[in-house]
From Swiss-Prot:
This is Co-chaperonin GroES. Pfam families: Cpn10. Gene3D superfamilies: GroES chaperonin. Heptamer of 7 subunits arranged in a ring. Interacts with the chaperonin GroEL. HAMAP family: CH10. The lineage of its organism: Bacteria, Bacillati, Bacillota, Clostridia, Eubacteriales. GO terms for molecular function: ATP binding; metal ion binding; protein folding chaperone; protein-folding chaperone binding; unfolded protein binding. It comes from Clostridium novyi (strain NT). It is found in: Cytoplasm. GO terms for cellular component: cytoplasm. It comes from the Bacteria. InterPro entries: Chaperonin_GroES, Chaperonin_GroES_sf, Chaprnonin_Cpn10_CS, GroES-like_sf.
């Protein structure tokens, strides 16, 4: 199944959190924070949003940092994704 976001929305797939601390301690699943780094898997067309022209600055495959509590989590074909607005993306990681 493909998902096509509308307007200035993007679909991201979170990158896995570290399983060990720098000192080598293994973290149980409940202790790991939600990762704030993700890969863009789909990008909306941009266009008029709230009466202003929005140009999409991210593309599929970009690695990004995003606001911790932003977006809507969805599950498709057993995979978890987050749909959020482009302005919830803080930076592109190069």
């Amino acid at each position: 199944m493909r998902i096509k976001p509308l307007g200035d929305r993007v679909v991201i797939k979170r990158l896995e959190a570290e399983e060990k601390t720098k000192s080598g301690i293994v973290l149980p699943g409940s202790a790991k924070e939600k990762p704030q780094e993700a890969e863009i898997v789909a990008v909306g067309p941009g266009g008029l949003v709230d009466g202003k022209e929005v140009r999409m600055e991210v593309k599929v495959g970009d690695k990004v940092l995003f606001s911790k509590y932003s977006g809507t989590e969805v599950k498709l074909d057993g995979e978890e994704y987050t749909i959020l607005r482009q302005n919830d993306i803080l930076a592109i990681v190069e």
